[in-house]
C-alpha cells in the first residue's frame, strides 16, 4: 500500500479490554477540566504540569457538535489532536476509533486524489465502501509533502499535536525530517505510532505488505477453508488487527504520558498483530505438533459446532461445548437419547473425530424442519444457535435495531447510514461527524495554525 506515493501498511475491538482504558481516559479528562480553572493563575510551566493529558489544549477550538447533537467535548479523548499520514485500512481504522472517542483527527491527503482508498469502489452513493467505513469524524488537509511549503505546514501542525499516526514506508518519515528521534527532540510529548507490514527492523522491513499477503505469512490461510482449498478472510483482517493494535497502544501511551509527561514511539507490525490473533491454532501446533485441521465453517476441534442443513430456509449454526449440552441436544432436539451412550460420540474429541457420521444423523433429523423451526427448538432447549446471515440480514438485524445502533453521517454525497461505535455506554454519547471531501478543511486549518499560503 502507498501513502502519499509511498509504501502502504495498513481494525474489531474488544469492548471489555477497552472499557478499563476508556474509564482511565475519562479520569484523565476530568483532570484537564480541573486544571482549566487554575489556568489563568499559572505560569506556562505550571499549566503544562497540570494539563498533562493534552499537549495542545490551549490551541483547541470550541468542541464541535455532531449531527446527533452530541458535543465531542464530552468524550474521553476530547482535547487530543492526532495527525494522520494514512491510507488504506489499518491507519484509518485506528484513527477513526480515536475519533469515535472524541480525538481530533487531521488526515493528510494528496491534493486532488486524496487517499487512494477513496477509489477502490463506488458502492456507497458513488463513494468507496472502505473509505466510508474508516473515515468519518475526520478533517481532510490536502498537502503535497514533496513541496517544502507543504512539509513546513505539516511540521507546524505537528508542533501542536499529541499523536502522529503514519503508515509510510520504513525510513520515509526520516527522509522528510519527521522521524521519531528528530520529533522527540523537538516535541518530547508527542506520541508517534508507526504502522508497517513487518515492523521497522528485521529482514522483512522493506517487503511490501498487503492484507492478503500478511494473512498468508501469519498462517491464517492454513486454518481457514477446507482441505486443499485454503480461504482468505472475507474482510481485511490483517489490516484490522494492525489498526486495533495501534489504537490500543495509543490509548495506553496517552495514559502513560499522563504519568511521565513524555511521549513515546509505537512500532506496530501487521504480521505481529496478526500472529497475536492466531491464538489457539498457533499453540495447537507448538513443539512441532500437527496444526488444527482445515474445517471450513466448522470448528476445528469441537463438534457439533458449525452449520447444518435443514428442510428449508437455509442452514442453521449451532454449537455446544460440554457434556450437559450434548445430553440435552440428543434428548430434546434429536429425540435420540441413546446417542449419549454411543462410544463414537462419548466426548468432544470423539465427536470431532467422527463428525461425518454425526453430521448425517443431525441433518437427517433437521431435514424434516424449516430453519426457523430448528432455531426455535434449539433456543427453547438452551442450545447455542445462530442464523447464517448475509449482509442484508445484518443491515436488518433486529438486535441492532432494538439497541439503537444505527445512525447517519453526512458525506460529500449526502447522508449515509453508519453503525454507532461498539461499547458506548449511552447510545446518545457517540460521535458521528461527517466523512470529509479531499482538502475540505484546508482553509480552516491554515487559518487556525497561522499558516500563510
Regions found by a protein language model. Name each.
Residues 112, 198-199, 270-275, 312-314, ...:
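Glycine-rich beta-alpha junction loops
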Residues 1-71:
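N-terminal mitochondrial targeting presequence
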Residues 310-314, 361, 372, 418-453:
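An anion-binding loop in the catalytic cleft
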Residues 304-381, 385:
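Aromatic-enriched alpha-helical interface/lid elements that frame and gate functional surfaces
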Residues 380-429:
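A glycine-rich dinucleotide-binding beta-alpha-beta segment and adjacent secondary-structure elements
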Residues 230-241, 263-265, 294-299, 303-305, ...:
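A short glycine-threonine-serine/GTX helix/turn-capping micro-motif
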Residues 243-263, 276-289, 330-336:
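Oxidoreductase and adenylate-handling cofactor-binding alpha/beta cores
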Residues 39-42, 49-259, 294, 437, ...:
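N-terminal helix-loop segment corresponding to the beta1-alpha1 unit
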Amino acid at each position: 500500500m502507498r501513502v502519499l506515493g509511498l509504501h502502504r501498511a495498513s481494525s474489531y475491538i474488544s469492548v471489555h479490554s477497552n472499557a478499563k482504558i476508556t474509564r482511565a481516559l475519562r479520569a484523565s479528562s476530568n483532570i484537564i477540566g480541573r486544571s482549566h480553572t487554575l489556568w489563568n493563575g499559572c505560569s506556562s510551566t505550571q499549566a503544562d504540569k497540570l494539563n498533562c493529558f493534552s499537549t495542545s489544549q490551549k490551541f483547541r477550538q470550541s468542541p464541535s457538535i455532531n449531527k446527533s447533537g452530541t458535543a465531542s467535548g464530552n468524550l474521553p479523548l476530547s482535547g487530543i489532536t492526532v495527525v494522520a499520514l494514512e491510507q488504506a485500512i489499518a491507519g484509518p481504522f485506528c484513527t477513526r476509533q480515536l475519533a469515535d472517542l472524541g480525538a481530533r483527527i487531521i488526515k493528510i491527503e494528496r491534493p486532488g486524489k486524496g487517499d487512494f482508498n477513496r477509489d477502490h469502489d463506488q458502492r456507497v452513493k458513488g463513494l468507496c465502501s472502505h473509505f466510508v467505513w474508516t473515515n468519518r469524524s475526520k478533517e481532510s488537509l490536502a498537502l503535497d509533502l514533496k513541496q517544502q511549503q507543504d512539509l513546513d505546514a505539516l511540521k507546524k501542525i505537528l508542533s501542536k499535536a499529541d499523536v502522529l499516526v503514519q503508515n509510510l514506508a520504513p525510513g520515509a518519515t526520516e527522509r522528510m525530517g519527521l522521524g521519531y528521534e528528530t520529533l522527540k527532540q523537538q516535541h518530547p510529548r508527542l506520541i508517534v505510532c508507526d504502522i508497517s507490514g513487518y515492523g521497522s527492523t528485521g529482514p522483512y522491513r522493506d517487503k511490501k505488505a498487503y492484507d492478503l499477503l500478511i494473512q498468508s505469512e501469519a498462517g491464517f490461510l492454513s486454518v481457514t477453508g477446507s482441505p486443499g482449498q485454503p480461504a482468505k478472510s472475507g474482510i481485511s483482517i490483517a489490516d484490522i488487527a494492525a489498526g486495533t493494535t495501534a489504537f490500543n497502544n495509543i490509548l495506553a501511551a496517552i495514559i502513560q504520558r499522563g504519568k511521565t509527561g513524555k511521549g513515546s514511539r509505537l512500532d506496530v507490525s501487521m504480521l505481529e498483530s496478526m500472529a497475536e490473533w492466531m491464538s489457539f491454532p498457533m499453540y495447537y501446533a507448538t513443539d512441532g505438533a500437527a496444526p488444527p485441521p482445515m474445517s471450513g465453517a466448522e470448528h476445528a476441534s469441537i463438534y457439533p459446532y458449525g452449520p447444518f442443513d435443514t428442510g428449508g430456509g437455509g442452514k442453521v449454526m449451532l454449537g455446544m461445548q460440554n457434556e450437559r449440552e450434548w445430553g440435552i441436544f440428543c434428548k430434546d432436539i434429536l429425540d435420540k437419547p441413546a446417542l449419549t451412550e454411543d462410544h463414537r460420540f462419548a466426548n468432544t474429541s470423539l465427536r470431532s473425530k467422527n463428525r461425518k457420521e454425526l453430521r448425517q444423523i443431525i441433518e437427517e433429523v433437521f431435514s424434516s424442519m424449516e430453519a426457523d423451526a430448528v432455531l426455535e427448538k434449539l433456543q427453547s432447549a438452551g442450545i447455542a444457535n445462530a442464523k447464517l446471515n448475509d449482509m442484508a440480514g445484518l443491515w436488518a438485524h433486529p438486535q441492532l435495531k432494538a439497541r439503537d445502533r444505527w445512525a447517519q453521517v453526512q458525506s460529500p454525497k449526502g447522508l449515509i447510514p453508519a453503525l454507532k461505535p461498539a461499547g458506548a455506554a449511552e447510545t446518545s454519547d457517540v460521535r458521528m461527524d461527517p466523512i470529509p471531501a479531499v482538502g475540505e478543511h484546508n482553509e480552516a486549518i491554515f487559518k487556525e495554525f497561522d499558516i500563510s499560503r
